[in-house]
């Protein structure tokens, strides 16, 4: 069984754990740097990206997270997690982890009061997935090797680049675990490649 970490500094940690377990993988709440060595994949949950960055810096997680990304182990960022994975952020000079060659705009759908749900078609996942958007970012631009998995209107809301997956919405806030299951499969495939 693959072991998937959920960065436990802030955000919808419990909900991600539940979704990972429902998808047939072991879930670990990651609160210490050394735990990164014990997991096969990592979820960066939604939350408030500025607060999350402060906590990542406070607990010296940034370089270990970048090292984890460079190791090729899969990472999945939802909402604020997408912001952490992006190489370019509109209106900001520097990236956070910067593992994905995507440009992201924060709070692109508006503030909290403008939160909404939308039925999405997601490549590799299926139709009618209810995306919960809360002060959501979206992807403005992608490199050629980034696969766009889903759009809402003309905005890219789910993308994949090799071992990295990012979504504007919160898949963990529904009882539909298909997006998490997709990530679990990515982790299984990556682990199998390492064994071979």
UniProtKB/Swiss-Prot annotation:
Recorded metabolic or biological pathway in which this protein acts: Cofactor biosynthesis; pyridoxal 5'-phosphate biosynthesis
Catalytic activity: aldehydo-D-ribose 5-phosphate + D-glyceraldehyde 3-phosphate + L-glutamine = pyridoxal 5'-phosphate + L-glutamate + phosphate + 3 H2O + H(+); L-glutamine + H2O = L-glutamate + NH4(+)
Gene Ontology cellular component annotations, sorted alphabetically: cytosol; glutaminase complex
CDD domains in the record: GATase1_PB
EC number: 4.3.3.6, 3.5.1.2
Binding residues annotated for L-glutamine, in chain numbering: 47-49, 106, 134-135
Keyword Lyase: yes
SUPFAM superfamilies for this protein: Class I glutamine amidotransferase-like
Gene Ontology terms describing biological process: glutamine catabolic process; pyridoxal phosphate biosynthetic process; pyridoxine metabolic process
InterPro entries: Class_I_gatase-like (IPR029062), PdxT/SNO (IPR002161), PdxT/SNO_CS (IPR021196)
Active site: 79, 170, 172
Keywords (A to Z) from UniProt: Glutamine amidotransferase, Hydrolase, Lyase, Pyridoxal phosphate
Signal peptide coordinates: none
One Pfam match: SNO
MF GO annotations: glutaminase activity; pyridoxal 5'-phosphate synthase (glutamine hydrolysing) activity
Family annotation (NCBIfam families): PLP_synth_Pdx2
Family affiliation: Belongs to the glutaminase PdxT/SNO family.
Description of how the protein assembles with itself and partners: In the presence of PdxS, forms a dodecamer of heterodimers. Only shows activity in the heterodimer.
Job of this protein: Catalyzes the hydrolysis of glutamine to glutamate and ammonia as part of the biosynthesis of pyridoxal 5'-phosphate. The resulting ammonia molecule is channeled to the active site of PdxS.
Official protein name in the record: Pyridoxal 5'-phosphate synthase subunit PdxT
The species this protein was found in: Bacillus cereus (strain ZK / E33L)
Underlying gene: pdxT
């Amino acid at each position: 069984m693959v072991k998937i970490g959920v960065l436990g500094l802030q955000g919808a940690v419990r909900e991600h754990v539940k979704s990972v377990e429902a998808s047939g993988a072991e879930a670990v709440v990651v609160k210490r740097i050394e735990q990164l060595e014990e997991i096969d994949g990592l979820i960066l949950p939604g939350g408030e990206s500025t607060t999350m960055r402060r906590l990542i810096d406070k607990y010296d997680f940034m370089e270990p997270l970048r090292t984890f990304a460079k190791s090729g182990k899969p990472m999945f960022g939802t909402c604020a997690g997408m912001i952490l994975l992006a190489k370019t952020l509109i209106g900001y000079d520097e990236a956070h982890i910067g593992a994905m060659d995507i440009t992201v705009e924060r709070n692109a759908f508006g503030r909290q009061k403008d939160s909404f749900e939308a039925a999405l078609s997601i490549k590799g996942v299926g139709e009618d997935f209810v995306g919960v958007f809360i002060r959501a970012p979206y992807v403005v631009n992608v490199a050629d090797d980034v696969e766009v998995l889903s759009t809402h209107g003309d905005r890219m809301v789910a993308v994949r680049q090799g071992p990295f997956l990012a979504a504007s919405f919160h898949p963990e806030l529904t009882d539909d675990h298909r997006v998490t299951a997709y990530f679990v499969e990515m982790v299984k495939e990556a682990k199998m490649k390492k064994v071979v």
